[in-house]
Amino acid sequence: MTITGSCHCGKSAFRIEGEMPAQLTRCTCSFCSKRGVLWAYYAPAQFEPTTPAAGDSIYRWNTKLVAHHFCPVCGCGTFTDSPAFEPDGSWDKRTRRIGVNARLFDDFIAVDAPVVVIDGKNLW
């Protein structure tokens, strides 16, 4: 199935080849908490920006391992390109994943999905 979504103004849009998430992830790190994002994770090959990537802004902090993409016009956090961290914060040093803000999916009510909490506040 194809999932589509975009930021509020539509300048940052995307397409995912995959299923709607069975669960979402809420990270408690300072950045994710302030953004209010609910993450759905996909393999990089499943995710495709449908608007020019050059239009996105990217924020990196702390270890600089995670690229947080957001729309420079409306400010919505759209997706991250990050290591495929395990819930305990470990990483195999090569596998990456795309975390997509499920609140931006078209035709999906994110609050209806179960949420897993990652203790990002204490992990990184």
Residues of each region from the PLM?
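A short Gly-Trp-Pro
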Residues: M1-S6, K11-W124
